[in-house]
Regions:
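Conserved beta-strand position repeated across blades of beta-propeller domains
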Residues: 35, 101, 152, 214-216, ...
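Predominantly soluble domains enriched in secretory-pathway, periplasmic, or organellar proteins
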Residues: 1, 37-40, 45, 107, ...
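C-terminal structured domain segments across diverse proteins
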Residues: 264-266, 279-282
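Short loop/turn segments that connect beta-strands within beta-propeller blades
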Residues: 16-20, 81-85, 132-136, 193-197, ...
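A short beta-strand motif characteristic of beta-propeller blades
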Residues: 21-26, 86-91, 137-142, 198-203, ...
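Residue-level detector of Asp-centered blade-edge/turn motifs that repeat once per structural unit
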Residues: 38-39, 104-105, 155-156, 217-219, ...
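Hydrophobic beta-strand positions that form the internal "hydrophobic ladder"
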Residues: 1, 43, 109, 157-160, ...
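A flexible loop/linker signature enriched in serine peptidases of the S9 family
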Residues: 1-13, 27-32, 46-76, 91-97, ...
Length: 282
């Protein structure tokens, strides 16, 4: 899917790689980043509200980031119904809200929001919450942790895969001996049980830094792109055995990797190495 400029707003175009045909699926959809629901019955958009304009010779800085242009702009979430063409704003407030994931049944959104904390490193706090689309009730799952980044649902929705620093969840992912400060660039993954709030630091003893790709619905494995010394390898984590497996791909530096949600035997990726760059594979 991709968008093109239409008469008023954007047109949503679908491209079929098998036939190389393009078709306009929806016309005059809202502008901005969007994500489909699993059943493709609605879209979630993320437009932004421009912050308060300040005129005159003086400007009050609300926080250090307020020196940056558009720092007062706030992203919010909108549900768009492609059948009726109606949009419903879902989030409000003084903090930007970002979509992290949509539950498999399409009934709930996993979102994150951040705020400044100028008195303590790393100078910001992040919360992860769940939004029920039927009631618009929000349930906070991770409350103002300075070291978490984003999260995703497990296929059954009972667990979360949270990405963050080793210092997240009171440092449960630290593996640096007696050194008091962990390397925040050594990104870790944590499985959080929604019911019990138990946190499992699955990558604490796994050497590469990880970047979450997908929790597959069929094989139940979690796929990561990793920074593995001077390589970018794709690994999968098998929850049943609590083990990691490196996928035997053709290149050592994988720049992008996409796996079919309902057929994990099918994937497409782009990578390079000593004698190649930007090579696509399926």
């Amino acid at each position: 899917y991709y968008t093109v400029t239409g008469r008023q707003r954007n047109d949503l175009v679908v491209f079929d790689p098998a036939t190389m045909r393009e078709e306009v699926l929806l016309k005059d959809v809202p502008e901005g980043y969007f994500a489909w629901s699993p059943a493709e019955d609605y879209l979630i958009y993320s437009p932004d509200d421009k912050g308060e304009a300040v005129g005159g010779p003086l400007k009050r800085l609300l926080h250090p980031d307020d020196r940056i242009p558009d720092a007062r702009s706030r992203n919010y979430l909108v549900r768009y119904d492609p059948v009726t063409g109606l949009s419903e704003r879902l989030t409000y407030g003084s903090h930007a809200v970002y979509l992290n994931d949509i539950s498999s049944d399409g009934k709930k959104l996993l979102c994150s929001t951040s705020k400044s904390n100028i008195t303590q490193c790393p100078f910001s706090l992040t919360s992860i919450f769940e939004l029920d689309l039927a009631t618009l009730q929000a349930d906070t799952l991770v409350a103002w942790d300075p070291y978490v980044n984003r999260a995703a649902y497990s296929p059954d929705g009972g667990q979360l895969l949270v990405i963050g620093s080793p210092m997240a969840f009171d440092g449960i992912g630290k593996n640096c001996g007696e050194h008091p400060i962990a390397n925040d660039f050594d990104t870790q993954a944590f499985i959080v049980d929604k019911a019990t709030k138990k946190v499992n630091p699955i990558t604490r003893d796994f050497n590469p830094a990880v970047d979450f790709l997908q929790w597959n619905r069929v094989d139940g494995c979690i796929y990561f792109n990793t920074t593995d010394e001077d390589c970018r390898h794709i690994y999968r984590y098998v929850p049943k055995t609590e083990s990691f497996e490196m996928l035997p791909l053709q290149e050592d530096v994988i720049s992008s990797f996409d796996l079919a949600e309902y057929n994990p035997a099918v994937a497409a990726y782009v990578g390079g190495g000593n004698a190649s760059v930007g090579v696509a594979y399926t």
